[in-house]
A protein has these predicted regions:
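A short alpha-helical cap/connector motif
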Residues: 1-98, 102-174
């Protein structure tokens, strides 16, 4: 609605531009996470992809890259275990990591910090579900079908770390 759009513009101006300088990515309305990942892979010649939380492979199946690993304890991907167990055993490095696993602050923060340890130089970590648009979508524990959880708290918290550059894209639930 109109109020939400105005609020988001003001929020962006006050909290994002004032802290980080103006970043302008005019994503088209039909630009989704798989489009962004494909763009980054091609632009940076990435060859190694990790996805945490694959569900039914909605994204994992669309990512075309030389080496890809998908970790999910229930379905999707190609490794059936929790992200914590995966990172304990992993020795591979990745160019691009997409995190869409358990949507809780504590777990997402662990997934991000673990991913940083296995990121190639000039690599990037993308985190989904950072911009819930209602209290119900961010409630923990989950009680709605559509759920972002409190992922956003990990983003706010990790912005305080000096060695990480963190940006939020207003697209596909952030």
């Amino acid at each position: 609605n109109k109020f939400t759009k105005i609020f988001k513009k003001i929020y962006y101006k006050v909290f994002i531009e004032n802290f980080n300088g103006k970043l302008n990515y005019d994503f088209p309305n039909n630009f989704y996470r798989w489009d962004l990942i494909e763009y980054l892979i091609k632009k940076n010649n990435y060859t190694n992809y990790l996805e945490i939380g694959c569900d039914q492979n909605q994204l994992f199946s669309k990512v075309l890259i030389e080496n890809k690993i998908g970790v999910d304890p229930v379905s999707g991907g190609n490794i059936r275990k929790t992200s914590d167990d995966f990172f304990k055993e992993n020795v591979d490095k990745f160019d691009i990591v997409f995190i869409d696993g358990l949507h809780t602050y504590k777990q997402v923060k662990k997934d991000i910090l673990n991913s940083v340890n296995f990121l190639n130089k000039n690599g990037i970590i993308l985190v989904h579900d950072c911009m819930p648009d209602s209290l119900g979508k961010q409630a923990v524990p989950r009680y709605k079908m559509q759920w972002n959880g409190d992922v956003w708290k990990a983003i706010v918290d990790l912005r305080q770390k000096e060695n990480l550059d963190i940006y939020t894209c207003e697209m596909d639930q952030g």
